[in-house]
Design a protein with these regions (language model features):
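Short, Lys/Arg-enriched N-terminal segments with co-localized hydrophobic residues
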Residues: 1-20
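A domain-level signal for the structural core that forms small-molecule/cofactor-binding pockets
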Residues: 17-280
Length: 280
């Protein structure tokens, strides 16, 4: 526990309890910058259509941002460029917008059905995972720059760019802070790509697909959200598998699960906001 009253875990042998490790990155990590841009573009699609189909890939780094968008929605490239600059600053934007594959479009023409094959798992969050999220949010309010944080049982590691190691050590005295010293980060130091921080987004619920840059017909979004929420509610592991085109999943119409996911996305402020921290 720290002087501010927050605790992240207690020492225990590996035999006494299940090994707990968790990583969390903040919204300014290059991979999360890519996720946020992808989320902002999905938000644009939902402004033009009630149920758009869209898949976005973003690669960003060293002054350049490459974006590929496959969609049914009529998205203005200038709006995409504005979103890139708002999130990532004055980078050169390479934007490619292509129509969705006709066969995939036909699959959804009679109504929303599962948009992909996949396996999904929801796991209840551990106390350490919840605590690390609190720590990450707390540090980010003081230092809104690229950072990564890890808990390995009783070990807390804080790597925070553009921050005083001494100040962070005072905030979290037992932590290992910036082991190699003060540093700068961001997309001029590292590159970022969509859906590379699955553990940070989903904790132990990681299976196959990522959460970002996709509409709600995509099982990677809707079923990951549904499985995660169900696991938190029941306190038990949730496992789901689906085939593309399925209209009943876990005993529910797929549209019902889409509605649950849509409500969750709305509650956090949209796809861009969802991309900042993921599911926890």
């Amino acid at each position: 526990c720290y002087s501010n009253g927050r605790c992240y875990g207690a020492p225990a042998s590996r035999k006494e309890r299940k090994l707990t490790m968790i990583e969390k990155v903040n919204p300014s990590h290059p991979d999360k910058v890519a996720d946020r841009i992808a989320g902002a573009i999905v938000d644009l699609a939902y402004k033009t259509e009630a149920a758009p189909k869209i898949a976005v890939e973003v690669l960003i780094g060293h002054g350049k941002c490459h974006v590929i968008i496959e969609t049914t929605a009529a998205i203005n490239p200038l709006d995409v460029e504005d979103a890139i600059h708002r999130i990532a600053g004055a980078v050169w934007a390479d934007i490619d917008i292509v129509p969705q594959d006709k066969h995939l479009s036909d699959n959804q023409s009679a109504g929303i059905r599962c948009g992909d094959n996949g396996i999904f798992k929801g796991m209840p969050l551990t106390e350490e995972q919840k605590a690390l999220s609190v720590i990450a949010h707390d540090i980010y309010t003081h230092y809104p720059y690229d950072g990564k944080y890890i808990i390995d049982e009783a070990r807390l590691i804080i790597c925070q760019s553009n921050a005083s190691t001494a100040e962070l050590s005072n905030m979290y005295p037992p932590a290992e802070v910036n082991p190699l010293g003060d540093w700068t980060g961001g997309t001029d130091v590292d590159t970022g790509a969509t859906n590379r921080k699955l553990g940070s987004d989903m904790a132990d619920s990681v299976t196959g697909g990522g959460l970002h840059g996709k509409d709600l017909s995509k099982a990677d979004v809707t079923l990951n959200i549904y499985a995660f929420l169900k696991a938190q509610e029941t306190g038990k592991q949730v496992q789901i598998a689906c085939a593309i085109g399925d209209d009943i999943i876990d005993g529910h119409p797929y549209q019902e699960l889409v509605d649950i996911a849509a409500e969750y996305i709305s509650s956090v402020g949209g796809f861009e906001k969802f991309a900042e921290w993921g599911l926890f």
